Amino acid sequence: ENPFAGLGKSGKLTLHNRKKAYQLAGESCVLLKNEKLLPLSMKKKVIWAGPYTASRELLSRWSIFGEHEAVETIEDVLQKKQIEAECITGCNILSDEECKVWQVEQELSDKPRDEQWLETITHEDTVVCVLGEHESQSGEAASRAFLTLPEEQQVLFEKIAERTSNIVTVVITGRPLDLRRISERSKAVIMAWRPGTMGAEAIIDLVYGRINPSGKLAVSIPWCVGQVPISYWDVKTGHVLTADNLENRFTSRYMDIPNTPLYPFGFGLSYTEFDVSDVEVRMEQDKRVHVHCKVSNTGNIAGAEVVQCYYETLHASVVRPMKELVRFQKVFLDPGEKKDVDFFIDQEEFSYYGK
């Protein structure tokens, strides 16, 4: 068998394929938090910090034949675009001890690691921290008990956070992580996943506003590792925690942490604002459920919104999830533009085993 017939080595890194890789990287990044810090102005000098500013390790573990030499680093792209910025690695992706645990070789950087540069950061400075897992820490045969960032990166982040609160954190990862501390001390957080060959350019263009983020989470980001596994479609129980019984101890709840994730499935921010209105649900003559709504861009820049349609089974003969995603549609809108969105759902799609 040859499932990739027609794809030769000469066609892998063409300009067309690079453009597609750039588009996919940009659209898959998820803006998790933004306290009016992003997008950054290119006229303002910014410090880019963290081991991923100088690393080509942006591919996924599943990219077995991926060519790291073809990946540009964030520092490379900043220089190519002539963006005024200072790049400091600060630490390695993994410590020497962590490299032994994960059976990888240390990726040595020729960048100086003198910590005196930290003393030059003032409370007015903006720092973009590019942090994350090593690519060996996700994918097959990479189970983890703790989902925090590697230790040296945590230390680096805390030292930066002691100097300034104007922090944008870009997270490179192949799985959900425990990002609570990062989120608490960052004014903006971008989940970049493992963005691939053109990931560095996509991240930079997103930070500076050339790309308006439109990605949504395909997983839930836990409030802490104790919530794992956590899913938006967790099944109902006989003692569901609701807004009406928050003081009732005898509900399905954690006593010391929230029940809800830090960032839920389907979540993702934009640099513009959207409004979904005029929602209608009706049964068509062919027995399909028709869901209609209008979505409008109420902000000042063009953007894309992913309209998501969920349903809940109120009564069933077996335990059903709290809610289930049944349809979604990505809608591109200019400022002030409004569009109709229609979903048609067959009745069979509401069926389940055991009925």
Predicted region positions:
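Glycine/threonine-rich flexible loop motifs
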Residues: E57-S60, L131-E151
